[in-house]
Amino acid sequence: MIITTTDVIQGAVIESYLGIVTAEVVYGSNFLRDFLAGIRDIIGGRTASYERLFEQGQRKALEELEQRAQRLGANAVIGIEIDTGTINLDQSGVLLLITATGTAVKMR
């Protein structure tokens, strides 16, 4: 399976467009991680725990996207976009949201 951000794959011919595929990954926040990230933000520096979480989430979203495309009979997903964001849950924290979207295609 080819997964790419481009809309064209050199040397390949798209036989059919099978539709838009989307995958979402949601993580709950962690009080200790949030606290330590806040301290790093105050003194400067990167928050490695959140960076790892977003990297892991992007990988999982792309894996899920590939599975959904395969169920449609695709052998490639083109035009991939990955979006990240947060969902506020009032006093109880936030959810981290990672979304991957692309177009499932059948190529030859």
Swiss-Prot record:
Annotated S-S bridges: none
Matches recorded under SUPFAM superfamilies: YbjQ-like
Superkingdom of origin: Bacteria
Coiled-coil annotated residue ranges, if any: none
InterPro entries in alphabetical order: UPF0145_dom_sf (IPR035439), UPF0145_YbjQ-like (IPR002765)
Pfam families: YbjQ_1 (PF01906)
Record-stated family: Belongs to the UPF0145 family.
Protein known as: UPF0145 protein Npun_F4817
Biological source species: Nostoc punctiforme (strain ATCC 29133 / PCC 73102)
The organism's taxonomic lineage, starting at the top: Bacteria, Bacillati, Cyanobacteriota, Cyanophyceae, Nostocales
